[in-house]
Amino acid sequence: MIRVDRGQVLAFYAVLLPVVLLPLAAYTVDAAFVSTQAAGLQAATAQAAEAAAQQVDVGAVRSRSVLIVDSLGARVMAAREMRDSEPGAIVDSVVVVGSRVTITTRETVGLPFNFLPAQAIVIHARASARLVGGYDSPSSR
């Protein structure tokens, strides 16, 4: 018996490689890149929320002995922290309610391979932090 379909496997791989495997590899690289950028944005947003929550309203502490966050100071600090750690990010909102600060950010990320119809993806992050009182004196007694 003589086989006439010799070389058919080579033709199969010649079609399979550019049609299936290369786009799959490009998608994998794009997904890993976006995931890394999203993790960086989340970390920067959390750091900005912590820094913003440390902006104490001194007037409220002095007049009413209440520990709350200064709204204006928190907004300025959040914008500064985000500008320093993630320059491409945009602060969508800084919400201050009493001693809690919630920051919402977004960033447009360009994809390394333009495999998908979208050339860029917008990622979002949200983080909250709370201002809490510490100890009264440095002594442990």
Ranges and model annotations:
Residues P112-R141:
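Low-complexity, S/T/G/P-rich flexible repeat/linker segments used as non-globular hinges
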